[in-house]
Amino acid sequence: YSVGVLVPESSGALIQHLRAGKEWDLDRKRDGLFLLLPQSRTPLSGTGDIDFYSQHLNYLIESKFDYVIKTTSQVLCNIDYRSAFEYHRSTKADVTLIYRRMPQNEKRSPGSVMVSFDKSGWVTDMEIDPPVSKSRNMHMRMCILSKKLLVDIITYAMSRGGGDFIRQLQANVKNLRIN
């Protein structure tokens, strides 16, 4: 495996925790763990996470792997992605979202992305921080997609001023096969 961690500024504790990746068998000369630091102090377009991803396009492009599991540091959980990856491949989805069904009485955190599905399991709507949501399915800010699609999303968004990865997915719910 190859794990690229996009490290925000002031991340000394994270870097110290990850070290060389030995604890996760990622301390190798080829592939392994890569800490990807910001290349500039100012965002390229001023908004969204696409800027940060665009700074590390070469890492993605040069990777020998065909798929990406994209996640965030805002969610802490223990997850084995193997079954999600197999599901992604078996459904021939463009993007597979990792989500959890929220209990009726549980409050959502600010910025939550709520996802609606049709009867076949395909995403029909994504709501970003809605005051009231028609769905109880909260996207965990984790997804599986091809490396090519991720590169395409980043380059498309950058050619239009940057933006946020989730908003790119939201804008393309009808064009992409998202489950």
Protein language model annotation of sequence segments:
Residues 1-179:
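Unchanged
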